[in-house]
Amino acid sequence: MSTSDDIHNTTATGKCPFHQGGHDQSAGAGTTTRDWWPNQLRVDLLNQHSNRSNPLGEDFDYRKEFSKLDYYGLKKDLKALLTESQPWWPADWGSYAGLFIRMAWHGAGTYRSIDGRGGAGRGQQRFAPLNSWPDNVSLDKARRLLWPIKQKYGQKISWADLFILAGNVALENSGFRTFGFGAGREDVWEPDLDVNWGDEKAWLTHRHPEALAKAPLGATEMGLIYVNPEGPDHSGEPLSAAAAIRATFGNMGMNDEETVALIAGGHTLGKTHGAGPTSNVGPDPEAAPIEEQGLGWASTYGSGVGADAITSGLEVVWTQTPTQWSNYFFENLFKYEWVQTRSPAGAIQFEAVDAPEIIPDPFDPSKKRKPTMLVTDLTLRFDPEFEKISRRFLNDPQAFNEAFARAWFKLTHRDMGPKSRYIGPEVPKEDLIWQDPLPQPIYNPTEQDIIDLKFAIADSGLSVSELVSVAWASASTFRGGDKRGGANGARLALMPQRDWDVNAAAVRALPVLEKIQKESGKASLADIIVLAGVVGVEKAASAAGLSIHVPFAPGRVDARQDQTDIEMFELLEPIADGFRNYRARLDVSTTESLLIDKAQQLTLTAPEMTALVGGMRVLGANFDGSKNGVFTDRVGVLSNDFFVNLLDMRYEWKATDESKELFEGRDRETGEVKYTASRADLVFGSNSVLRAVAEVYASSDAHEKFVKDFVAAWVKVMNLDRFDLL
């Protein structure tokens, strides 16, 4: 047993007592605050992807760099790479086409339409957990094969763009005509922390398809991109996989035709790898030893590569021309009878029992094998609805080619937002409904026009609360994950947003603003809605004794109803918006966690979120006009009263019922109820990180700073979808 005497004795001999043990003394080691308090509010999610982690610096302009790219020279190099087989990872049939298609597919396929997160837009396949998912075995090799090309072209092409372009070139080099390619995906430099991949603690934990409809998850098992290719929970039953397939592809916004096209198209080229038992496969890249240099899954089976490669454990080749585009997938699917069998690794798959050996071996030209299929491939034949589509594609290969080209383009561009963000020479001209298209601008308001419109709005009779509320309702639908939503398009005036419960009060201002727009004919309704917020904030600041100019950039347009996919826009309806003290459901997370979620979608920092909530409360912008969180006697005045009164120890807070969603703030001396609040209000006094920010804004010298910070954050939200201003 060590005593204080031991410490003194060690010091006397010239040895530091704290350097004697075997403890990990590196930064970040030891028990963390999250270990002690696992339910701690994730304020850190608002600090992701800062310039401190970006080696290119905040002045780097990817669009500018891309304009210097020899685009077709890059495609030529990618085409050459496809057939330059490397001994450390030999190419099947001398082509990496199937590998690169899978890399692009698995990068894009993490997208979930329910919350807009995931997808290929930031090159996340380079980082954990995706770089080490069980479904991404061997894609580390695909990325490493691309390194010489990335090294050559440097920052003129992002990893995120290169992954998808490599998949496109692989298809084109195999004889397929793609729909096009839009660049513009900017790399980030650390893993996304905000994506909820699920609660499971073990890889490949099975999820019931019904559970996928209740959570923002895109796969039926933890660590898969879509579904288990052996059927749900390794059932081996093609029909049982239909519900899972629909759920997962539906979560990406794909219908049955797109689903069939994507599965069949993705399985027209290449193969799966299951030469031997998966027990021979080593740790994934994140767990691999340092000398592996970021590669993982080293195999001890035979040579570990080429004919001995193990990836999924399945050993399937679908078509007799696995490096050339064809309709053989459907021809084989319906021509032969299929019997269940197992791969050399023991995985469940199907073989065409009555077929001749027509499938070429990937490394020995003298060998042939029978066609094989995944359990989930046969779902396309035996599910009645999928079968109808599959037979149509069987009989009309051109229809299949067109459907796959469009579905592949949608898959690989779904998280990029509107077409205005696409760059490069191969951007398709056609507007697609899932891109949330917008018309061309028809207004170009002058400075005088804007001044006149501001006067008209100010004289309209709308209160500060109404002006601020309508602008927030329009702009706050933006999602940073897939760049959907926002004020541009004025879709607040269209279905479904006009009928959302959260917008019930806000849309009451629309008829007034629509009248101003029609009478002036000088600006779009979208611009006038945002300008209403400008007027409201400036009036509120003036009432607080400050003359503030709120920046305004015209140029928004008004979308039409036929340019608005109602079903897809329903996904933007918030289940909670803590900025407006709105919550529709109590069975999803905590109110304060949902506030963080909303702020993260709006790309806000913790100080920006704090300033906005405090300002929205004193401006009376609650969705239902309630007084929850309105800690002021001067509603409509842009003051720091919210913070001053929240942190005032004269008041003590008690929940109004067992749900602990609403609270009363009582005077400690008189017992009088002074204020009411939600969890989205009290979190700024409860959470230590947010309280630290709130204390800044509550200080006696902070009023002007608070107003300026509120205005800056407000303008940021109003312009989140103004990609034309970048």
UniProtKB/Swiss-Prot annotation:
Alphabetized, the UniProt keywords read: Heme, Hydrogen peroxide, Iron, Metal-binding, Oxidoreductase, Peroxidase
Gene Ontology terms: biological process? cellular response to hydrogen peroxide; hydrogen peroxide catabolic process
> Per the record, which residues fall in region Disordered?
1-33
Q: PANTHER family from the xrefs?
A: CATALASE-PEROXIDASE, HYDROPEROXIDASE I, BIFUNCTIONAL CATALASE-PEROXIDASE
Report the GO terms under cellular component.
Answer: cytosol
What Pfam families does the record tag this protein with?
peroxidase
> Where in the chain is the Tryptophyl-tyrosyl-methioninium (Tyr-Met) (with W-105) cross-link?
Y226-M252
Recite the UniProt cofactor note for this protein: Binds 1 heme b (iron(II)-protoporphyrin IX) group per dimer.
UniProt-listed CDD domains: catalase_peroxidase_2
PROSITE patterns per UniProt: PEROXIDASE_1, PEROXIDASE_2, PEROXIDASE_4
The record describes the protein's role as: Bifunctional enzyme with both catalase and broad-spectrum peroxidase activity.
Briefly state the modifications made to the protein after translation: Formation of the three residue Trp-Tyr-Met cross-link is important for the catalase, but not the peroxidase activity of the enzyme.
The protein's superkingdom reads Bacteria
Q: Which cofactor does it need?
A: heme b
The protein's site described by Transition state stabilizer is found at R102
NCBIfam families in the record: cat_per_HPI, PRK15061.1
Q: Which GO terms describe its molecular function?
A: catalase activity; heme binding; metal ion binding
Name of the top EC class for this enzyme: oxidoreductase
The chemistry this enzyme catalyses reads: H2O2 + AH2 = A + 2 H2O; 2 H2O2 = O2 + 2 H2O
Tryptophyl-tyrosyl-methioninium (Trp-Tyr) (with M-252) crosslink residues: W105-Y226
**Record's subunit section:** Homodimer or homotetramer.
Know the name of this protein?
Catalase-peroxidase
Key word Iron present in the record?
Answer: yes
> What family does this belong to?
Belongs to the peroxidase family. Peroxidase/catalase subfamily.
Tell me which EC number(s) this protein carries.
1.11.1.21
Which residues does the entry assign to the active site, renumbered to this chain? H106
